[in-house]
Every structure is written in C-alpha cells, then in structure tokens.
Swiss-Prot record:
This is O-methyltransferase 3. Induction: Up-regulated by phagocytic stimuli. Gene3D superfamilies: Vaccinia Virus protein VP39. InterPro entries: Methyltransf_12, METTL2/6/8-like, SAM-dependent_MTases_sf. The gene is omt3. Residues 146-180 form a coiled coil. Residues 411-437 have a biased composition (Low complexity). It comes from Dictyostelium discoideum. The keyword Transport does not apply.
Amino acid sequence: MNNKTSNGDITNDEPTVGSKRSWTDVNYKFCEDKEKQVVEEIQTETSWADVDWDSVRESIAKSITEKETDIIGEEDKIHHEDNAMDYWDKFYKKNQNKFFKDRTYLHLEFPELNPLKITRDETFIFFEDDDAAAEGAENGGGGGGSDNLYQDKDDLEKQEKEREKKMANLLSKNVDIKELKNRWVKDIQELTNDESKKLTVLEIGCGTGATVYPLLKLNPEKYFYVFDFSPHAVNLVKSNSLYNEAKLNAFVCDIATEQIPTSIVKDNSIDMMLMIFVLSAISRDKMHAVANSLFKSLKPGGVLYIRDYGLYDMTQLRFISKKGKKIDENFYLRADGTRTYFFTTQVLSEIFEAAGFKTLVSKYDTRELRNRKRMISMYRVWVRGKFMKPLDNENTENNSKILSIYNDPINNNNNNNNNNNNNNNNTTTTTSTTTTN
C-alpha cells in the first residue's frame, strides 16, 4: 500500500518482517538508492527515547551532507542577512503566539532554574492551570517545529496518555496533590521574600514568551530581562496578561548587529543568560561578536545556558533533499525566509571560549522519535551547553551568587562528561546523553 513519510513523500509497500509491519528509518530516505531500510531489533514502541547516535548512523548522515553541492547565490545570502529581522517579524505577525508551545521543560535540564525542585511527573500539575501541561517535557526542541502547536489527533491522544501516566505515577507514590500545591504556595512565598536568592536573568531571543513565562512561574525570586530583534514578538510578550514590569522587562535589540543597551542592562549585572534555539538563527561569522556582547553583560561567575540544533539532526537531513536551501556549511534557509545553523559541540565551545567563557557543559542530546501510524523512526539531535564567565578573584563582591545558592551544581553536574567532550568532540563524532527533556 502507499504510505507517506514524515517529509510528505509517497512510498510503496511498507517493509515487513514475517507477517508484521516493521519500522523504517527515515534517514535512509536521503541515500542515493532511495530505498527505505528496515530498522532491526526495535524491542518497544516508546517514542522520544534517548538513543545512541552510533558511528554507523553518523557515517550515513555524514556521507549525505558531503554530497551537497548547491549553495544559494551571494546576492541571496546578502538579501537574507540584511532582512533577517523582517523575515522573523513576518513569522510572528503570521503565527502570533500560537506556533510554539510553552517550554515547560527547561527546569528539568537546568536545575538552577528549578528552585522549587519540581519533578518531571509533577511538572504537568504545576502548569495545568495555565493550559501548558508537560508536553514540552516530552517534545523538548524549540524553534523550527519541534515544539510547535500544530498537532494531529495522534499527538493529542499521546499527550493525554502521558498526563494519565504521570498522574498514575504520582498516585502510586501516595502523593497528595492538594498537599503538593500547598507546599508550592509556601515555597514560592519564601523564595519571594528571600533577598539573598534574588537573581537577574536575561533571555536572548525571547520570541513570544514561550520560555520566559513558564520560568517566571517557576522562579518568582528572579527578575527577567528579555529581548528579541522582532518588534512584533516583543509586543506579543508585553501584551500577555502575565506581563508585569516589576518582574519582567522586554525590549527590542538585534544582538547580531548591536550591543545590549547599557541603559537597560548594565555591564556585569546578569546572573543567568538563556539562548534557547536562538544562536542558530544568526550567521556563523557574527556568532563571535554575539558571544563578546553577552560576556560584557554577565557577572563574573554568571552562567549562560544554551540549547540548540545539533549536527545531523533530522531537520538538517530534510534540508538536503531540497534544492537551493543551503547558505553555507551547516547553515540553511527555511521556506519562510528564516535561517538555521546546526552545531557541533566543538564549534559551540570554541565560540564562547574565544570570548572568555569557561565551558562547563557542552554535549549532545540525541533522541529517537517514532511515528507509530506511519511506522517510521526519526532522529533529533540537539546541543546543550553551560558557559561561565570566570570569577573575579580580586573583588568577590562582583561575583554572581549562583554557585553559592545552588551549592555549585554547575561545576559538579556532568563534570566528567564535560571533560570527555572537551577531549573527544569533533565534527564527526557525536555521543548520546541521558538528559531530561
């Protein structure tokens, strides 16, 4: 029978093993012979599982990307560089705040953003009153579609099953939901009143607020600055009923072409920074200037948290099948005129270390995504990083309070993995990580 792949192409005769339908690895679709390959030995049908991005699969992905030859012309490159803001502004005008789901999963990845110590199972309860339950915890990606709101019936059914599963997990542990919520109310009050834990957070590329508003609820003791180079996106943040200047300041800034205004954010004043699927939208040759600008605003001891697209992600392989989409090495043009870059951990670390940051964590997060209806297996690859501005040993009062507040989880967390990454990472070697998402 005819079947559609996730990319919309029609294929004939679903492969079978014996009398059973079998899973197909969608990456093989891009190979020269165009034949779909059966994924062997899939024991379960668990979607969004951590996987080992093994050398065989990486070799296939690398051989595919090396065959790319069509690069858009210089005139088109200049046009999309000069009009990058306009294309994103059009994107937000078209989609408003309805494209991306709230990212209610970042506290699970970065414990410094989880002062209430909310677990994965508790997350959907914490956010359920906001109609933003824990879908994000399963769908962990960001810009470009992995956490967008356009979902089919199968997606919604899966999410409902996940909610039921998590509720069952809590009940099996004899968790009293009412008592849990009362505890959060008490903890929030204590955090808000504790002057020693008041930190400042800056989000670079805030979009419509899909990151900042969940984090505001989770981090009542922190003050947030957020900016975007799309005026329409910033207006959407400000029009949100939760916008409160006592807790949040949103403004327009193009980090790729200008410094962060010191009239709003003073140098050496920020404790934490967030770049969630933002750096990839900037031209590679401007990333170093961006890192330098962020370094100036961050306090000594402050930390920059990054999540973005990794090399050989499923979406990169999709670009390869489309002519006229490659701008430069690992840099592509979307249909709507926006752009995206795919990182290695080595490149990510080099960018920020050159600006003076210390790499604390730089690793891959690889996931297998299975579509049961179409029986296809796809792979997402992200990079996740933590970069610290070195401490000021001469004047310790200038240093951020992050390390003391959180008992230095940044340096203790995944320190061995970070050392391994620094020693072993290159553009042709990726590693699987077990991360919350």
